[in-house]
Amino acid sequence: MFKKVFGNKNDTKPLKILLKCILDIEAKEIEILNPEILGSSYYDKRTIVDLIVKLEDGTKIGIEMNTNVNKYLIDRNLFYMFKIMSHDIKKGKMYSSLNKHIQINIDCEGKHISPIERYSLMEKEKHKILTDKIEIVR
């Protein structure tokens, strides 16, 4: 049902509303990408994300709806996020061309302190953000 409502390429309005509610962004142009991420080898783990969205500024958003939460959920979603990122830069391109990536994990159990929690890579003691290229939302 989730993919049917939010993954419709012909009607992206529900997806834009979802992104507005979760990320507080006004997405004017969005492109729903192929959710299957192919590996470079036959032996690579097959990866199918619920939704992969590309915004007009190049930001890519992986969205996962999780009905059964387990202790490896975050690890799995990190894996998905980095797989999406690994396809961003092609041979000969500069690392500076890496786009921002956001992984949204919608957890149906909802046992979080606040309705939306946003995480980034930051230094532990001084809380200095290392990069704005990665964000995890749950």
Model-derived segments and spans:
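Elongated, amphipathic alpha-helical interaction scaffolds
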Residues: 1-138
